[in-house]
From Swiss-Prot:
GO BP annotations, alphabetical order: cholesterol homeostasis; positive regulation of lipoprotein transport; positive regulation of wound healing; regulation of cell growth; regulation of intracellular cholesterol transport; regulation of intracellular lipid transport
Membrane topology label: Multi-pass membrane protein
Entry-linked InterPro entries: EXPERA, Sigma-2_receptor-like, Sigma2_recept
Name of the molecule in the record: Sigma intracellular receptor 2
Phenotypic consequence of E11Q: Decreases DTG binding
Signal peptide: none
ER retention motif, short sequence motif: residues: 172-176
Tissue: Widely expressed in normal tissues. Expressed in pancreatic, renal, breast, colon, ovarian surface epithelial (OSE) cells. Highly expressed in various proliferating cancer cells.
Induction: Up-regulated in ovarian surface epithelial (OSE) cells with progesterone.
GO CC, alphabetical: endoplasmic reticulum; lysosome; nuclear membrane; plasma membrane; rough endoplasmic reticulum; rough endoplasmic reticulum membrane
Length: 176
């Protein structure tokens, strides 16, 4: 597979990632920060099922720091998702480079405390977490695996934007 074909495969992966992120953000993540009345009972039940089944303490009783990440997702990331979907599914949109770098770094930065919480928090002593919590290493790793794509795909995006010869920044020079 040549460089243009590889680039198109990565662009399609990224386009589908952003496309899939729209309903996940709207119907799951933002329930923690938007009024409950906005969501049909089916979506509320889906979130309850997920949070209980996977013992996700952040979505059962979201702490303030996690809600701040969700607010950023609402204000900054959600408007970017359709733009990024368009740019990557269309392909060859060099203008997406800078916004994609900003998105990827922001998202990876928010995932560090989330994944660290799942891996290292002593939930038996943590009074800020109510409801079911991961108790075993297997339950913690299961939660990490649910959130890991939101660290890995932005990392791929960042490397792609920084290393792809197609997306590399070229300084425009004035002709004399």
């Amino acid at each position: 597979m040549g460089a243009p074909a590889t680039r198109r495969c990565v662009e399609w992966l990224l386009g589908l990632y952003f496309l899939s992120h729209i309903p996940i953000t709207l119907f799951m993540d933002l329930q923690a920060v938007l009024p409950r009345e906005l969501y049909p009972v089916e979506f509320r039940n889906l979130l309850k099922w997920y949070a209980k089944e996977f013992k996700d303490p952040l979505l059962q009783e979201p702490p303030a720091w996690f809600k701040s990440f969700l607010f950023c997702e609402l204000v900054f990331q959600l408007p970017f998702f359709p733009i990024a979907t368009y740019a990557f599914l269309k392909g060859s949109c060099k203008w997406i480079r800078t916004p994609a770098i900003i998105y990827s770094v922001h998202t990876m930065t928010t995932l560090i405390p989330i994944l660290s919480t799942f891996l290292f928090e002593d939930f038996s002593k943590a009074s800020g977490f109510k409801g079911q919590r991961p108790e075993t290493l297997h339950e913690r790793l299961t939660l990490v695996s649910v959130y890991a794509p939101y660290l890995l795909i932005p990392f791929i995006l960042l490397i792609f934007m920084l290393r792809s010869p197609y997306y590399k920044y070229e300084e425009k020079r004035k002709k004399k």
